[in-house]
Design a protein with these regions (language model features):
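Conserved catalytic core of the tyrosine transesterase superfamily
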Residues: 1-287
């Protein structure tokens, strides 16, 4: 039987008009926390239980700091909004996130991965990540009506932060979409472009990830540190390398802050092989 607090959390999320992805993550996390408590009533749990849950996520489940922090935010929302019970946040620290540079595919690797994706559905999903800069959740939730072949653009509805935006629809991706349509012709009341295995709802994140991982394996591309988000990072980095201005990329990516986009400047500079100024003032004698 579902705990009544989950219905309250759902209502509170919908009143705040949070995006669908936030709703799904918060509800799954709250249910997971209730399972973690076991027989202990939610009302009897306190900060020590939330701390134990945080350690469990990091140490036992080996989740990344960013994921742990998202889960903690969901649990705190359940307590502070759902139960109207303030928590001592000093006792529930969020994890520091390492500032790692985003990994990107080289253009040669991207060509190999796309060529290795034998299923047209997987190929077009990979193309949407790399060619249009879509997040994996945005690929899953893409609707047929979002594809504007006349203006050559995609409408991303209810993206991260519950924001809508337009992004590029490359000619090669449109050709793949048409090929995909000829094979699958998805028909769903909600208009999802990519359906799940039983046709009830849209495709899952895990199915899209599988398509990319299989294509990388067949292409012989190193998978370590690479995910579907790497396609999006490669989209931004390669646009910068080609001279696209930062504000345009920010808009295409759906970033709320320019600093989020500026991270890719450093990656693009490294990829360009930026020369050190010392090379212009002194030449090594061994050259």
């Amino acid at each position: 039987m579902q705990h009544p607090i989950l219905a309250k959390v759902l209502s509170d999320i919908e009143l705040r008009n949070h995006g669908g992805a936030t709703k799904d993550v918060y509800l799954r996390t709250c249910a997971r926390y209730l399972d973690f408590l076991g027989d202990k009533p939610l009302e009897a749990a306190d900060e020590s239980d939330v701390r134990a849950f945080s350690r469990h996520l990091r140490c036992d489940c080996c989740l990344a700091p960013k994921t742990v922090n998202t889960y903690l935010a969901a649990v705190l929302f359940m307590y502070e909004v759902g139960l109207d019970r303030p928590m001592n946040r000093r006792q529930i620290p969020f994890m520091r996130k390492p500032k790692a540079m985003p990994k990107v595919f080289s253009r040669e690797e991207m060509a190999a991965v796309l060529a290795a994706a034998e299923n047209v559905k997987h190929r077009v999903q990979i193309s949407l990540g790399y060619g249009s800069g879509l997040r994996i959740s945005e690929v899953c939730r893409l609707r047929v009506r979002d594809v504007d072949s006349e203006a050559m653009r995609l409408l991303v509805e209810d993206g991260k932060g519950a924001k809508d935006r337009y992004t590029l629809l490359p000619a090669t991706t449109l050709a793949l979409l048409r090929e995909y349509w000829e094979v699958y012709r998805p028909n769903h009341a909600e208009g999802w472009l990519f359906l799940g295995p039983y046709g009830y709802t849209h495709v899952t994140d895990s199915a899209v990830r599988y398509g990319l991982s299989e294509a990388m394996r067949k292409a012989g591309v190193e998978p370590a540190g690479r995910s579907f988000h790497t396609l999006r990072a490669s989209f931004a980095t390669h646009l910068l390398e080609d001279g696209t201005d930062l504000m345009t990329i920010k808009s295409l990516m759906g970033h709320s802050s320019l600093s989020s986009t500026a991270v890719y400047l450093h990656v693009a500079d490294m990829a360009r092989g930026v020369a050190s100024p010392v090379d212009s003032v002194m030449a090594p004698s061994w050259l």
